[in-house]
């Protein structure tokens, strides 16, 4: 059985998180060679740029490889995707052209990214993996799945559809991974996940991963799992180290645009992400920034899948430097060069705050998060500070020196 987690695009030079690890699994492996992994998988790991396992990888890969159900919680950017990807690749039998591992992710972008990681780590293994996501051609999806893929990564709706059509065969699946479990088990996906789960073999191994795991999610997850190993980062450590957090007082909503333009006139920014709470606001802000001669890209869930992929590609390559988006991007998308995250709107759900600001400091990279605060937002800001045991200070005049 296998397990798999989220891995960034560059090597893990500074991957060791500062966070406190609590674990019911006490074996710790501080290098990949001691994990008794396949030779061709090790080649893929080192070829991908990894030198040593991160804290979560040191603890979670082996119980996953040994077939245990695992609840793993770690900060965004600590190598979660690699954790379950490595465990999956260690366990699959590539001589059987059937789906042996099924990974669900909350967004198409995250599913696509995970699939890329599996293919990269499994480069020397003749592994077949497919991203089964909405917004793509159903017939083509069905054709690829019918021909057999060892690892399928997808969004819940499309995966359920493909199982129903009998083109995604489930009888060989030995591992079921839920990435970003808090989001996946939230109201929107809970029923779909349960529908998929019911169609899997009864002895399937289950892995749940997320940056945040509220008690109710842990409770729900236990319905799926047998005697799971828990590997958790203490909640107060979850605000990412290396991210400087500030707020800017903006008296009224309609003053935000001027404040944003002033910021961009002042700062020299490699790349930045601006979060708004609604798709409409994303479109509106994109239009207003363009009128003020700022070059920006926008992405949200109303867009065609092809358009979203083009925008993400441009942003990853650096040809687009400012991306305005909703929480669609907040979960798990690796964009390595992001130096600044701006919460144009504070997230309506405090759980999303860490997913948003985690965009700026993956793998120990330094980053700055700036929150625009109206008078109505003060209570929400206070709530976020208390929830994460953190302090968000007023933005200093020398902000340019910090980015």
From Swiss-Prot:
Q: Which reaction does it catalyse?
A: ATP + H2O = ADP + phosphate + H(+)
Q: What is its EC number?
A: 3.6.4.13
Motif: DEAD box; annotated at 179-182
Q: Where in the cell is it found?
A: Cytoplasm; Cytoplasm, Cytoplasmic ribonucleoprotein granule
Kindly report the protein's main subcellular placement as a broad class: cytoplasm
- Write down the Pfam families for this protein, in alphabetical order: DEAD (PF00270), Helicase_C (PF00271)
List, alphabetically, the GO terms of the cellular component aspect.
cytoplasmic stress granule; cytosol; eukaryotic translation initiation factor 4F complex; nucleus; P granule
Q: What class of enzyme is it?
A: hydrolase
- Residue ranges of region Disordered? 1-20
InterPro entries associated with the record: DEAD/DEAH_box_helicase_dom, EIF4A_DEADc, Helicase_ATP-bd, Helicase_C-like, P-loop_NTPase, RNA-helicase_DEAD-box_CS, RNA_helicase_DEAD_Q_motif
Q: Which GO terms describe its molecular function?
A: ATP binding; ATP hydrolysis activity; RNA binding; RNA helicase activity; SMAD binding; translation initiation factor activity
Q: Which UniProt keywords apply?
A: ATP-binding, Cytoplasm, Helicase, Hydrolase, Initiation factor, Nucleotide-binding, Protein biosynthesis, RNA-binding
Stretches that traverse the bilayer: none
Q: Where is this motif: Q motif?
A: 30-58
| Family stated for the protein in its record | Belongs to the DEAD box helicase family. eIF4A subfamily.
Functional note: ATP-dependent RNA helicase which is a subunit of the eIF4F complex involved in cap recognition and is required for mRNA binding to ribosome. In the current model of translation initiation, eIF4A unwinds RNA secondary structures in the 5'-UTR of mRNAs which is necessary to allow efficient binding of the small ribosomal subunit, and subsequent scanning for the initiator codon. As a result, promotes cell proliferation and growth. Binds and antagonises the bam-bgcn complex; probably prevents bam mediated translational repression of shg/E-cadherin. Involved in germ cell formation.
List the protein's name: Eukaryotic initiation factor 4A
Identify the gene encoding this protein.
Answer: eIF4A
